Swiss-Prot record:
Native source species: Homo sapiens
Disulfide bonds: none
Region described as Disordered: spans on this chain: 40-61
Tissue expression per record: Very high expression in prostate and prostate cancer. Faint expression in other tissues.
GO biological process, one term: chromatin organization
Protein name in UniProt: Putative Dresden prostate carcinoma protein 2
Molecular function terms, GO-annotated: chromatin binding
Amino acid sequence: MEPWAMRALDFADESGSVSCKDMHLLLWLQKRIEMHKAEQCEEEEAMTPRPTKARAPLPSAYVPPLSLPPCPRERLKGMLKEIKPRLSRNCREDPQGCLLNLLLQSHSRSPERPLQRRERRYLQRRREKLMLARRGITLQKMEMPKQTRHRKLKVLEMPSEVCAFLITVYFW
């Protein structure tokens, strides 16, 4: 028996009575011991070798097409034949580049849609900030004098704790 399980049996008094709390603890320990034994039995069963049956392979959901050529270049040519009506004359010279362009166009935003007003504003603001940063002008230098004055007044309105303490001591 485990040493922690042996300690569980020491809960009884000399008279042999056990409190309700100790009884719950004993029952819990007993369940833990049974679970531990069951786990050990399962581990032993798992370790013993069993005769295995030959299993038939499960039918997979994916069936590869038989006509797909193994070479990537051949695959590209096959894909280009399927999308040939979309291609222009100069794409026939460089099929891989044209295919790459088609793939990129399919994933990106359509170029026909004009930028919305918000997007234009955002791009314009971003461009302006970048230009100012290149020139070395920060936003603080561009601030209006009213904003700076307002910020200074706000700081003066809220004295620090040290100032408040000194004022209190001075007028006491």
